[in-house]
């Protein structure tokens, strides 16, 4: 163990030097008394003188060392006092009793555990955010690629726009006053054509059905998939709605004003053909001679001379449903004005067009109704209708009122082009006359005043 630093060693060293110093002070050897016998050093005088000389030589150095040790002791005492004061201050500040130490350790442990849990949560959150950042970076890169692709497409479209526009729908060049006129001019293909009836201010587009015999039918109604909602207002039925296609595979209503202009334009009357198809693929037809639709001033009234034949039967003449003796009379359509939900012209105290969801030549209400609601599968019931009425696409003389057709077509042709098939009537004697309340309607050319589209 080193004696240089430990306070206890310094104290011992100090007392040893003090003892020697006191001895030297008690007896200082000189040349005069060197040989005087001194009983403390025995009988050998020279030895006593040697010790005296030795002590005399080192006395000054010892005094310096003593002074230095005293200074060090004072410093040690000062430091010791400071340490004691510091210990006392620490004890005053923090001096738990033995019983509280376990609780404090537990509290510190719990606090450490919570801190670790928080650290783990932050680490997990950092990992989650890193994952989100990577995901967003991927989306950002993907969107940048999409933007590049869109810019390329825009550039392609801009290049295409520099070229002259071309119609993607084929519209034939031949025009006429109706589709039969177009067929007479040499048209052989069914499709879209412009016609301009004699009293029309401008031409309009129609779908012409041209057969191999040179018959040109002007189609004004088509149902085939339920893609078009036929619950429209008066203006929409007047102008027409739906879509015309070159292949005749879209639903539409040509427009009451156009039907009126076509069907009343010449002395040659028109014939109406109704084509029906059920959900089993069976088809049937019904033909009506001298068909026409009046002007808007007369609410686009429907009239015809007689039923010209067809296996679908004459639903326009009404049908006896067995509900009332007057069923047939109040479900006939000849002479009826056109009705829509916002323009009621029927014979019913209610509104047939509103309750049946369509526009039609309503009586009270109908036996044939080709603008009705499109029911998938055909069969429907009172429970499936909003008001419990037969509102489907019906033709009561071929199917029941609770069977809705899959496909229908209404088209007209000049009466002299009507093909006479097996079982069809073609004689005026079998004509069914118009209701007595409208006797003038049998005169085809004199009923309507001149009017324009």
Swiss-Prot record:
Disulfide bonds join 179-208, 352-365. Residues 170-416 form the Fibrinogen C-terminal domain. Residues 423-437 are annotated as: Platelet aggregation and Staphylococcus clumping. The keyword Coiled coil applies. Residues 424-453 are annotated as: Disordered. The modification Phosphoserine is found at residue 68. Changing residue 301 to C: In Tochigi/Osaka-2/Milano-5/Villajoyosa. Residues 1-26 form the signal peptide. Residues 400-422 are annotated as: Gamma-chain polymerization, binding amino end of another fibrin alpha chain. Residues 442-453 have a biased composition (Acidic residues). SUPFAM superfamilies: Fibrinogen C-terminal domain-like, Fibrinogen coiled-coil and central regions. GO terms for biological process: blood coagulation, fibrin clot formation; cell-matrix adhesion; fibrinolysis; negative regulation of endothelial cell apoptotic process; negative regulation of extrinsic apoptotic signaling pathway via death domain receptors; plasminogen activation; platelet aggregation; positive regulation of ERK1 and ERK2 cascade. Gene3D superfamilies: 1.20.5.50, Gamma Fibrinogen, chain A, domain 1, Gamma-fibrinogen Carboxyl Terminal Fragment, domain 2. It comes from the Eukaryota. CDD domains: FReD (cd00087). GO terms for cellular component: blood microparticle; cell surface; collagen-containing extracellular matrix; endoplasmic reticulum lumen; external side of plasma membrane; extracellular exosome; extracellular region; extracellular space. There is a cross-link at residue 424 (Isoglutamyl lysine isopeptide (Gln-Lys) (interchain with K-432)). InterPro entries: FIB_ANG-like (IPR037579), Fibrinogen-like_C (IPR036056), Fibrinogen_a/b/g_C_1 (IPR014716), Fibrinogen_a/b/g_C_dom (IPR002181), Fibrinogen_a/b/g_coil_dom (IPR012290), Fibrinogen_CS (IPR020837). The gamma-chain carries the main binding site for the platelet receptor. A long coiled coil structure formed by 3 polypeptide chains connects the central nodule to the C-terminal domains (distal nodules). The long C-terminal ends of the alpha chains fold back, contributing a fourth strand to the coiled coil structure. Together with fibrinogen alpha (FGA) and fibrinogen beta (FGB), polymerizes to form an insoluble fibrin matrix. Has a major function in hemostasis as one of the primary components of blood clots. In addition, functions during the early stages of wound repair to stabilize the lesion and guide cell migration during re-epithelialization. Was originally thought to be essential for platelet aggregation, based on in vitro studies using anticoagulated blood. However, subsequent studies have shown that it is not absolutely required for thrombus formation in vivo. It is linked to Congenital afibrinogenemia: Rare autosomal recessive disorder is characterized by bleeding that varies from mild to severe and by complete absence or extremely low levels of plasma and platelet fibrinogen. Dysfibrinogenemia, congenital: A disorder characterized by qualitative abnormalities (dysfibrinogenemia) of the circulating fibrinogen. Affected individuals are frequently asymptomatic, but some patients have bleeding diathesis, thromboembolic complications, or both. In some cases, dysfibrinogenemia is associated with low circulating fibrinogen levels (hypodysfibrinogenemia). This is Fibrinogen gamma chain. The lineage of its organism: Eukaryota, Metazoa, Chordata, Craniata, Vertebrata. The gene is FGG.
